[in-house]
């Protein structure tokens, strides 16, 4: 039997800092909302695994360090098993792009980085 994990609305927010390599690979780091420690990743698939781990660990309380404006913000509204639903936003823009799965999130990130 699979464990069911739900994240209440607004509980998981990540600031993403991305860089596209000459070979097309996207790497970077993210900063969980309630943590002062950035997490680096070498691919989008690794990013997903590390974000999943970050949502399973209680976050530290305290102030978020002042850093540069992120490329994107990912808000996970619902999470059940390995399925995420949420919003991908660019800072400074009011509206975001909704996603209903991790695959949709990755597709949105890839298409936004191609621009």
Show where each model-derived region lies:
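Intrinsic disorder/low-complexity detector
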Residues: 1-14, 22-24, 49-82, 115
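Short, low-complexity cationic-aromatic patches
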Residues: 7-12, 19-23, 38-45, 80, ...
């Amino acid at each position: 039997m699979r464990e069911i994990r739900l994240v209440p609305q607004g509980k998981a927010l990540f600031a993403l800092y991305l860089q596209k390599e000459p070979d097309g690979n996207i790497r970077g780091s993210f900063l969980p909302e309630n943590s002062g420690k950035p997490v680096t990743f070498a691919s989008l698939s690794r990013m997903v695994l590390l974000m999943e781990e970050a949502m399973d660990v209680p976050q530290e309380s305290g102030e978020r360090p002042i850093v540069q404006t992120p490329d994107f913000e990912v808000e996970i509204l619902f999470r059940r098993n390995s399925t995420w639903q949420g919003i991908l936003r660019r800072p400074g823009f009011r509206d975001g792009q909704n996603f209903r799965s991790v695959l949709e999130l990755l597709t949105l990130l890839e298409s936004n980085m191609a621009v």
